[in-house]
């Protein structure tokens, strides 16, 4: 059991936040602990494109990481190309998708498989449900005393990237809240 937290909602339509979001996921889903820069970068571009596409194009109730995963696994490469080609030229998802698209066919296939493997926890309906909407206010600790408990397994690292996302974004949100609302920041 867990309160729900839509990690994708923290992107708030900002490209820089999308980059941070993607970076945390890629760095915390390497099975060996040390990734290959080429593949990591390619997967980052594809994930950033999917995140920005969902964040900017979907209705609010469908803006979540599970929807980005569904795009990855349910659309063919041709269908993805059509989706991204239909975006306005200035759409922030176009540039990272364009970088992904410039690679060879075999590389693109490897990137899709690699990213799908990293995000395979979203095959689980419970994980999709927990990350589909917000019940947690990351700014609340700045407004009133409260505690959040983030329990992770000491034997299985499968879900560690979600706790890494949570901690990264809670620090960002609290610092921004303090800068805007507290005397002296």
Please state what every model-predicted region is.
Residues 1-185:
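P-loop NTPase motor domains
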């Amino acid at each position: 059991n867990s309160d729900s937290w839509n990690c994708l909602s923290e992107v708030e339509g900002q490209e820089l936040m999308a980059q941070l979001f993607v970076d945390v996921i890629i760095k915390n889903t390497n099975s060996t602990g040390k990734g290959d820069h080429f593949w990591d970068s390619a997967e980052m571009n594809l994930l950033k494109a999917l995140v920005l596409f969902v964040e900017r194009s979907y209705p609010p109730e469908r803006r979540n990481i599970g929807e980005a995963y569904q795009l990855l696994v349910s659309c063919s490469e041709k269908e993805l190309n059509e989706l991204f080609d239909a975006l306005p030229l200035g759409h922030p998802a176009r540039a990272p998708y364009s970088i992904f698209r410039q690679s060879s066919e075999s590389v693109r296939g490897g990137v899709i498989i690699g990213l799908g493997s990293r995000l395979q926890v979203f095959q689980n309906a419970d994980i999709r449900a927990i990350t589909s909407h917000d019940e947690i206010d990351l700014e609340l600790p700045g407004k009133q005393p409260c505690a959040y408990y983030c329990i992770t397994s000491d034997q299985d690292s499968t879900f560690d990237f979600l706790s890494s996302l949570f901690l990264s974004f809670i620090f960002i949100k609290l610092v921004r809240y303090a800068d805007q609302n507290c005397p002296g920041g």
